[in-house]
Amino acid sequence: MSLQVNSVAIMLVVLILLGVLSNNNSITISALILLLMHQTFLGKYIPFLEKNGLKVGIIILTVGVLAPLVSGKVQLPAFKEFLNWQMFLSIVIGIAVAWFAGRGVNLMSSEPIVVTGLLIGTVLGVAFLGGIPVGPLIAAGILAVILGK
């Protein structure tokens, strides 16, 4: 087996180092998995990940968010609690973020050039500001609104 040293491999190694230095397992593990796939016979599955990874990731994220409701650790609020301003604001913000993410997916599909900048910004936010890597969709959605897309 020979290693492929190219800009993609170097970028993934840099991401792994950033993830380790910032103690961010999400970046470290993701970049490590992709580097291993890129450097081995598993590379043939990268197009599958590219096509379906976002959908699968959103499903896993949604399961993780809903799991505390199912386990009973978080109780569903009583109807009267839906009438307070914090619950109302939470619902409105949830709707807005979902709308931004939908716009973001469309922008990322129609203008792939913005993906690089969004990914760099997201990685920096994850690595140094303690964020989580759902940022590209939201960032792309906000960018889409700013660009009038």
UniProtKB/Swiss-Prot annotation:
Keywords from the UniProt entry: Cell membrane, Membrane, Transmembrane, Transmembrane helix
Membrane topology: Multi-pass membrane protein
Transferase as UniProt keyword: no
Record carries keyword Cell membrane: yes
Chief site of localization: membrane
Record-linked Pfam families: DUF441
GO cellular component terms attached to this protein's record: plasma membrane
InterPro entries recorded: UPF0756_TM (IPR007382)
Subcellular location, record wording: Cell membrane
Chain segments annotated as transmembrane: 10-32, 56-76, 82-102, 126-146
Coiled-coil regions listed in the entry: none
HAMAP family, alphabetized: UPF0756
Homology family: Belongs to the UPF0756 family.
PANTHER family (alphabetical): UPF0756 MEMBRANE PROTEIN YEAL
Protein known as: UPF0756 membrane protein MS1439
Native organism: Mannheimia succiniciproducens (strain KCTC 0769BP / MBEL55E)
